[in-house]
Amino acid sequence: DPETHELISSPRTEQARAFVTKIWNASRFVLGNLEGFTPGEPVAATPADAWILSRLAGLSERVTQGISEYKFGEVASDLHAFFWNEFCDWYIEFSKASLREGADPAARLQTQRNLVFVLDSALRLLHPALPFVTEALWEQLPHAEGEDAEALMVATWPEPETLARFKNAEAERAIELV
């Protein structure tokens, strides 16, 4: 009722708000740590890199298949778990050592490249569910040479076949032990 000026709120609304805030803050972290960045390919230079790239490859498979099978609840759950638990809670935390002042410049650059690649791919996978937020953030990311999409909505999808090169069951098992 517009006359009562009540806020729309529910546990799911609060969870969605918290997730969007997490996406925004993680993106701001990555964007705020790109001093000296030059585009380049993602490389599994560390066990954490191998793990997150492998997890991203699996996510792309599950999301692509889930969308094709209209399993939107599973897709949303997979995206949330990857972004919040794996990318934010683990990989960003692992990356901080390489991003510190005084860290090895080559390790810093590769960490930056991997952060940008994973964030870019995650935003592409999240885009069907969160188009406005993901578009605004994606437009701020540095893009690889040859990326000719002017907007995320027309950018290429992170195809499972393309990301399959990152699959690494051993790296996933190693990080699970941490």
Task: Indicate residue ranges for each PLM-predicted region.
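Catalytic adenosine-cofactor/nucleotide-binding cores of aminoacyl-tRNA synthetases and other
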Residues: 1-43, 143-148
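Acidic, turn-prone loop/beta-hairpin segments
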Residues: 36-64, 92-178
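Aromatic-lined ligand-binding clefts that engage carbohydrates, nucleic acids, or primary amines
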Residues: 76, 80
